[in-house]
Amino acid sequence: MDEKNILSVLDSDFIVRLRMTFKDTKRVYLLTDAYLGGDLYRLLSSRGPFPDMVAKFYVACVIEAFDYMHRRGIVYRDLKPENLMLHQNGYLKLVDLGFAKKVPSGGKTYTFCGTPEYISPEIIANAGHNIASDYWALGILIYELLSRKTPFRAKDDLTVYENALKGIHGIHFSNRIGRKAESLIKALCRQLPIERLGYQKGGVNDIKKHKWYSGFDWEGFHVLALPGPILPEINDPMGDLRNAKPLRRDIDIPEETSGWDATF
């Protein structure tokens, strides 16, 4: 229900748009706009790691989406390349708000959720979290876009969590990641949430003013005036699914009779 309620009040060029909802005896459905360029993970796997110019553009899309959500007290909690879809204009759309939650100003939430390699230390420690956890994840995203790897990767989730708790300053940065980008990543991935860039007094503008973004046209970007760095090949905007993941159709779901979805 949270995903439906949150999507219904969001209206941003950088976030998926909900058009309508409906249900049957087995499923509930969220009808959204289709973004036929595929997800960023697929693009990163085939064309990454990205140069700075491309990574800056894609991260800027996330910054705009986060700024819009955070101003409304909504924490996202599931940032990863798979949840960023490429529009035909080359811009990204933030999708899958299943973990998104409205948190009162000054408050925290305690649900353990997210993708292991992107989860912040305070979520791991069950210390309570807020929008600052999204900025931690943003730092992880920058690292992955520039290197095609996540900084705390390991063979199992427990070791990933242990690595994250040790902190970003013990992580080796490859030559693919320049000093300015490294500086931004470390500023976003501070262990203490109150010290993270984006969560301090200057808010998201502190990120926009970081030296990694020197010369970036934020005003033009905000109104979608900048050309997208990679334009997906889409022959038919009504049905070209070449960039989409194939759907599983072999799952048999029993009918729902509990009535939990009465108000959906």
Language model features with spans:
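A short, aromatic-enriched beta-strand patch in the conserved N-lobe beta-sheet
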Residues: 20-21
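Conserved short submotifs of the Hanks-type protein kinase catalytic core
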Residues: 26-39
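AlphaC helix of the protein kinase catalytic domain
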Residues: 41-50
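Activation segment signature within eukaryotic-like protein kinase domains
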Residues: 58-59
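C-terminal regulatory tails of eukaryotic serine/threonine kinases
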Residues: 194, 199-264
